[in-house]
């Protein structure tokens, strides 16, 4: 098992292989960000506020529209609130104005009230710059791994330990 540690060249090759896997995943993420024009092209639904359209744990694919394709009422968007890190997935229920100056009001399908309480202090509506992207597709329950890792931090340690162990004992 630990014989690979006795050969420094093999250990270095395994470390490089692991680094290459991580850098490839990072490059794919950044490439997807550029292609979709979204800083976060994939998000996970963290709550039940969009049921029945989307369930907790669904993985959403986003596309950030340009100026010529305006966000429409009824469209599901993902937005960030100033001062908070968690993206929110909700439907546009009202729109005031057009173009870059349009103001949007959102609401979760499973919520009784609109999102004005979720917006930043002094903000009554969303603006175009708040939108991360519009939902163009989803994979049901694929994002549950992310939720489990967030709710149970010890799972991250276990997963990283297993990955590290696999790198050490891998034979070529």
UniProtKB/Swiss-Prot annotation:
- Give the E.C. number(s): 3.4.21.89
Broad EC category: hydrolase
Instruction: Kindly state which keywords UniProt assigns to this record, in alphabetical order.
Output: Endoplasmic reticulum, Hydrolase, Membrane, Protease, Signal-anchor, Transmembrane, Transmembrane helix
Question: Topology: which residues are Lumenal?
Answer: 36-172
Q: Reaction(s) catalyzed by this protein?
A: Cleavage of hydrophobic, N-terminal signal or leader sequences from secreted and periplasmic proteins
Top-level division of the source organism's lineage? Eukaryota
Q: What is its main location?
A: endoplasmic reticulum
Tell me where in or outside the cell this protein is found: Endoplasmic reticulum membrane
One GO cellular-component annotation of the UniProt record comes to: signal peptidase complex
Q: Which residues form the active site?
A: 49 (charge relay system), 90 (charge relay system), 115 (charge relay system)
Transmembrane residue ranges: 15-35
A biological process (GO) of this protein is:
signal peptide processing
Topology feature Cytoplasmic, residues: 1-14
Region entry C-terminal short (CTS) helix: which residue ranges? 158-169
Q: Which InterPro entries match?
A: LexA/Signal_pep-like_sf, Pept_S26A_signal_pept_1_Ser-AS, Peptidase_S26, Peptidase_S26B
Tell me what topology the record assigns in the membrane: Single-pass type II membrane protein
Subunit comment for this entry?
Answer: Component of the signal peptidase complex (SPC) composed of a catalytic subunit SEC11 and three accessory subunits SPC1, SPC2 and SPC3. The complex induces a local thinning of the ER membrane which is used to measure the length of the signal peptide (SP) h-region of protein substrates. This ensures the selectivity of the complex towards h-regions shorter than 18-20 amino acids. SPC associates with the translocon complex.
Q: What does this gene product do?
A: Catalytic component of the signal peptidase complex (SPC) which catalyzes the cleavage of N-terminal signal sequences from nascent proteins as they are translocated into the lumen of the endoplasmic reticulum. Specifically cleaves N-terminal signal peptides that contain a hydrophobic alpha-helix (h-region) shorter than 18-20 amino acids.
Q: What is known of its domains?
A: The C-terminal short (CTS) helix is essential for catalytic activity. It may be accommodated as a transmembrane helix in the thinned membrane environment of the complex, similarly to the signal peptide in the complex substrates.
Q: What family is it from? A: Belongs to the peptidase S26B family.
Name of the protein: Signal peptidase complex catalytic subunit SEC11
